[in-house]
Curated annotation (Swiss-Prot):
Pathway: Cofactor biosynthesis; thiamine diphosphate biosynthesis; 4-methyl-5-(2-phosphoethyl)-thiazole from 5-(2-hydroxyethyl)-4-methylthiazole: step 1/1. Coiled coil: none annotated. Catalyzes the phosphorylation of the hydroxyl group of 4-methyl-5-beta-hydroxyethylthiazole (THZ). ATP binds at R117, T163. InterPro entries: Hyethyz_kinase (IPR000417), Ribokinase-like (IPR029056). This is Hydroxyethylthiazole kinase. One of its GO terms (biological process) is thiamine biosynthetic process. GO terms for molecular function: ATP binding; hydroxyethylthiazole kinase activity; magnesium ion binding.
Amino acid sequence: MAPHDLLTALRDQNPLVHCITNYVAMNIAANVVLAAGASPAMVHAPEEIAEFTPICGALTINIGTISTPWQASMMAAAATASAQNIPWVLDPVAHFISVYRREAAQQLLAQRPTILRGNASEILALTGETGAGKGADSGDSVDAAQGAAKKLAAQFGTVVAITGPVDYLTDGTREAQVSGGSSLMPQVTALGCSQTALMGAYAATGPAFDAALAALAHFKVAGSTAAQRADGPGSFQMHFLDALANTQPFELAQVIR
């Protein structure tokens, strides 16, 4: 599906997106999904997973503030989504900073996410390569991680998105790049995490590669628009949500190459 068709479908269908994300990201992730035209649900109790995940259009998992109870919820939700062909997105935030986090990320990856999203350092580290990441921030270039992305796509049958100044997307065969956005985007905490939630919304409406591409493009368009109106990171966040809501479908194709 073309990006403009996916944005139209997302707004028409208003899919329910199950977001298991981190404490820092919950508010902005929910608002990003709402602004785009979908419906977020921040459900993470293990006791609810079996009933809730199956009624959602997509699942997103972000390990930013993972703990043992949340890990149980993530694994159960991922297994449910995979078993019931519900698209799901994995964001292995800073998985390289501890043994616990690395093991959790690898266990989730083994569940074969529909889309894997990360920065260059996170994607490199998933293949065992040493990156230069600092916490949740990347110290590696998107270009340097493209080979790792293709390897992961082939190994796990997933679409891999590397986010950065110019985003890169591959399913192991097809490739795309998305430009635009703003240097203010990394200055708003958890904005990148909220993109994972947006990818889930798009994945509920169309094929995985097309959905990830549309989500990347929507973010870049909104970032560019918001930057023209913002005085700094605080006002940028406000204008970014407005820009997501007001993005016209035809604009998405303008940032894709």
